[in-house]
């Protein structure tokens, strides 16, 4: 409770330039870290074969759609949450946090189900050729399974940021990226799982 009071005081009484700087730096680092996630996969997959790299490239568009859904619910609900917290309407803020989370999860689940059902046509739509099709289906199939969790994590991340907890949001994103940097080479190279390990 003390932390939320401190946030309220900081966001409403601190000089505007200081608030912007304090919120912007962790947000920028979070965005760069998200890009690092994709770059790490491409780097380690590059040691397998060119088809695998192409498959990861084909899947980037779908990953962007999944991320956009997370940002959609995160920014929409987060904006409302911040205004309600500013007005000290805590119950309304809590309701919106739950609503944003649930809608994000359900949309992610819908993407996962439809994506798995139409995996082959989806890969072709994204630009997959017959050569890279098996690799793209393997990689994108796993990405789609994680869609509900990706959307909800990004939604929660943005909700935290809108509450003035940009530092916690950054730590959450960075821990995921670091975990990926450790697990990707282990699964791809050491356990020889190939593109599935990415």
Segments (PLM) and residue ranges:
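Short alpha-helical transmembrane segments in multi-pass integral membrane proteins
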Residues: 1-24, 81-148, 179-182, 186-198
């Amino acid at each position: 409770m003390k932390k939320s009071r401190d946030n309220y005081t900081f966001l409403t009484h601190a000089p505007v330039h200081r608030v912007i700087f304090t919120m912007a730096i962790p947000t920028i680092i979070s965005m760069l870290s998200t890009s690092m996630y994709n770059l790490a996969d491409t780097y380690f997959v590059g040691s397998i074969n060119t088809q695998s790299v192409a498959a990861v490239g084909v899947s980037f568009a779908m990953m962007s759609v999944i991320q956009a859904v997370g940002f959609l619910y995160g920014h929409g609900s987060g904006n409302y949450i911040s205004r309600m917290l500013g007005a000290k309407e805590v119950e309304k803020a809590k309701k919106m946090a739950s609503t944003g989370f649930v809608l994000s999860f359900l949309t992610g689940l819908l993407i996962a189900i439809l994506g798995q059902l139409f995996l082959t046509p989806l890969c072709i739509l994204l630009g997959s050729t017959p050569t890279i099709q098996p690799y793209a289906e393997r990689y994108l199939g796993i990405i789609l399974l994680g869609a509900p969790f990706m959307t909800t994590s990004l939604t929660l991340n943005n909700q935290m940021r809108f509450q003035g907890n940009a530092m916690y949001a950054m730590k959450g994103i960075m821990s995921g990226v670091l975990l990926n940097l450790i697990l990707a080479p282990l699964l791809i190279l050491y356990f020889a799982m190939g593109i599935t390990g990415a």
